[in-house]
Each structure stands twice: as structure tokens, then as C-alpha cells.
UniProtKB/Swiss-Prot annotation:
It comes from Homo sapiens (Human). Changing residue 60 to A: Decreases interaction with ARL2. Expressed in retina pigment epithelial cells (at protein level). Widely expressed. Found in a complex with ARL2BP, ARL2 and SLC25A6. Found in a complex with ARL2, ARL2BP and SLC25A4. Interacts with STAT2, STAT3 and STAT4. Interacts with GTP-bound ARL2 and ARL3; the complex ARL2-ARL2BP as well as ARL2BP alone, binds to SLC25A4. Interaction with ARL2 may be required for targeting to cilia basal body. Interacts with STAT3; interaction is enhanced with ARL2. InterPro entries: ARL2BP (IPR038849), BART_dom (IPR023379), BART_sf (IPR042541). Changing residue 112 to A: Decreases interaction with ARL2. GO terms for biological process: maintenance of protein location in nucleus; positive regulation of tyrosine phosphorylation of STAT protein; signal transduction. Coiled coil: none annotated. This is ADP-ribosylation factor-like protein 2-binding protein.
Amino acid sequence: MDALEGESFALSFSSASDAEFDAVVGYLEDIIMDDEFQLLQRNFMDKYYLEFEDTEENKLIYTPIFNEYISLVEKYIEEQLLQRIPEFNMAAFTTTLQHHKDEVAGDIFDMLLTFTDFLAFKEMFLDYRAEKEGRGLDLSSGLVVTSLCKSSSLPASQNNLRH
């Protein structure tokens, strides 16, 4: 095999694995946006959000909650992916994800990060608690809507685009 054939083979192999990765990420987006998943996650967070406090020290109760979350949510996502891709392997995907993390939409990556990064998991709960208690980020007072069109001296009923 000459060098050109080797490059071609590597390119087609890379493209196939990239296509598989992209397909999994697409399915993940569908699963995470699905009402069933949203309800599953919301019910779990409703059950435990009052346990979480915005302090440096972590309570002992956080560990079993984190483990239960991983078991429940990761298992659900893996089952959903296996229905769509029978040969799916979560461990292999997680490894591939580390190499492609810059290519994955932020919300998907953040969600997956909550399975492996305790601080991301805790932050998710703190954000949820703040939202439930009405302490969420409110940008409404800083928003101003400005028309991008020039105002016209014609009444609105006569201000039609002319082609």
C-alpha cells in the first residue's frame, strides 16, 4: 500500500467514526429534549434540590444523591441510545467525547459532564434551587427592543415593501 492509499484509508475511517459520533450526539439531543427525559430529570431534582447549599463544604448526603443520579439518568440515556443504535457502547462514546468535546453543543456537553464531574452536578442543583426560589438570573430589566428598520412617515397600513 502506498502513502496515498494510506491517507485515503485513514480519511474514510475517520469520516466513518466522525459520522457515528455525530449520529450519537444527534440522538443525545433528541433524548435530552424529549419530554420524558425532562420529566425524569425534573422529578429527580425536585426530590433533592433543597439538600444543596452554595457553600465550599460538601455535605455527605451529596455522594449518594450523585450516585443515584448517575444510575438513573445515565442508565436512561444509555437505554434510549441502545434502542436507536443496538451496538452502542457508552464507555467507548465517553472516550471519544473527550477528543471531540469542542464539537459538541454546550448544553449536551454540560449534561454529560454532570455524570462525571461532581462540581458540574452540584452547580446544576444550585442553579435549579435558585430558579425554584426565584433567585434566577433576571435579564429583563436590561433588555431593550429596537427596530432595525427605518421608521417611515407613511402610516403602518401604507408602509408596504415595494418590489
